Structure formats: structure tokens, C-alpha cells
Amino acid sequence: MKKVYAAMGTDILHHGHINIIGTARRFGDITIGLMTDKALANYKRLPLLSYEQRKKIIENVKGVVKVVPQDTLDYTANLRKIKPDYVVHGTDWRTGDQKEIRAKVIELLKEWGGKIIEPEYTKDVSATMLINQLNSIGTTPELRLSKLRKLIELKPIVRILEVHNGLTGRIVETAKVNEDGSMREFDGMWVSSLTDSTSRGKPDIELVDLTSRLHTIDQIFDAT
């Protein structure tokens, strides 16, 4: 039986993932390279479910023979170990952040005659989009604190930038750098009364009244 490899990092399984697995199943036995918690935290976002929980879900999908950890966005270690006949991925990685990863996979597969299978990317759905929709419902201080603890646990560096108006909030929210196939972005924002005071031309002794502080926070919420 031919060997098929597909990488996934999801904790919300949707029909796009099922399409990928369904395509892969036609070519042989599927091994899923499931991104670890640390890999996901450094690439996309904090996972909602732990690696073991996500692994249990994927293992029970029809056609999946094995689930192995993928510690980075780079496929190299797992592909050299498994030497699959096929790697399956949606067409979305032909452009954007994963373009370089795709090129590297193609070169690697040439070493043993492997091929890439690229089913059409399922549009209008993604795990990130679904999670953002859930987050839009609201959050609590307890949830934010739990998320911060998990960030500190999983990431070697947690990137927090000070914000003091809507523009700086937008910078934190949208600034991204693609470095060696890995996305770098800010994890959160911090509102400093000291900087808020200085940005208003006042002494750097946090001399800003509560109404002004709330107005600043309202500006940030409105822009982000």
C-alpha cells in the first residue's frame, strides 16, 4: 500500500479537513502529521485542545492509519523518516506564508520520487475563522488570564506591545512577519498609563484622569 502524508494543526475539524483526508485516502494509507501545541502557538494561535486531545479526534477519522507529531511548520524531519509516496495539501499553500514550505517539500520528495497531491482548497471556512466567530461572542478576565498562562507555557517569548490609541492597537493586531516559513506576530497588547500620559504631553507620572483612560481604551476597542 502506498504511503500518504498530510499535515494538520486544527482543533476544530471541519469539512475542508475531511475533503483533504478523503482525497488522501484514495492514494493509500494516511499518516497525519499533527502540529504540536508549541508549533501551533508559534505559528497560528493557542490551540483550544491539547495535542493528545486533537490526536484522539484525528485517529478516529476514517482512513487515518497513524498520527505523528509535527514539531514545526517544516515537514523535513517527518518526510525523511516516513518517505511517503504522496504529500496531500490544499491549493492554498501555493501562495502566501506557506509558499516556501511547499517549494521545500517538492524538492525533498524528489529524493525518493514522491509526489504532491493538491485538492482544491475549501473556501469560506477555516478553523481560525470559526474560532474568531466564537471569540466574538465575548470573553472574561478568567479566560484571558488562562490564555496568557498558556502562552507563557508554550512560547519561549510572548510578544506584548504597549498601545495608547487606536492606531497602535491596529499595529499590534495586524503586524506580521514571515520568517523561514513561520509567522511572527504580537500575542497581546498592554495599555500603560505612563505612556498614555506622555503621549498627551503630560508629565510622565501617570497623570491621566480615569475618564481619559477609559476613552483611550474605548478607542482601542473600536479600532481592533
Where do the PLM segments sit?
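Hydrophobic faces of well-ordered beta-strands that scaffold small-molecule active sites
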Residues: I32, R159-N165, D187-V191, T224
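Alpha-helix-loop-beta-strand connector modules within alpha/beta enzyme cores
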Residues: P203-T224
